[in-house]
């Protein structure tokens, strides 16, 4: 968690993806689209409520620390820097799997396959609107750019 927070805090600024470019992608290629996440976006999966621990420690809230239930089960978090600062929030586990695939620049189809139970179009639209991606391309093109 701390690594993701530090990464978000010190990530370079980057303009969010210009969504109009997505409209130019031919329908047969939609499943091959891959995204590049904003440099401040990170994903954390933990067996304990590390987000609650982080907040309690940051606010030096002994009552909140005492109230944390370590047996509450796993958490799936997204960490990002936005206009308000660094934020960490929970995602449903299937959405986290979907975003984990997308943030690894895997294809949209691979992300859908990793979380078939979600409404991928709605989830993707929400994350695009929030500016969590900065670039896209067909997966084969992105692999060449990154390597």
Label each region the model flagged.
Residues 1-26, 84, 89-147:
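Long, charge-rich, low-complexity alpha-helical segments
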Residues 1-86, 90:
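Hydrophobic packing positions characteristic
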């Amino acid at each position: 968690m701390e690594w993701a927070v530090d990464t978000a805090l010190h990530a370079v600024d980057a303009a969010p993806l210009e969504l109009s470019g997505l409209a130019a992608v031919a329908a047969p290629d939609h499943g091959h689209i891959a995204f590049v996440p904003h440099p401040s976006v990170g994903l954390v999966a933990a067996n304990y409520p590390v987000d609650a621990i982080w907040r309690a420690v940051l606010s030096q809230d002994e009552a909140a620390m005492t109230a944390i239930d370590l047996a509450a089960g796993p958490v799936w978090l997204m960490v990002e820097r936005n206009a308000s600062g660094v934020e960490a929030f929970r995602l449903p586990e299937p959405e986290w799997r979907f975003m984990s695939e997308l943030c690894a620049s895997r294809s949209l189809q691979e992300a859908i396959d990793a979380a078939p139970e979600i409404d991928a179009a709605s989830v993707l639209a929400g994350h695009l609107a929030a500016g969590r991606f900065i670039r896209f391309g067909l997966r084969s093109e992105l692999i060449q750019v990154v390597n």
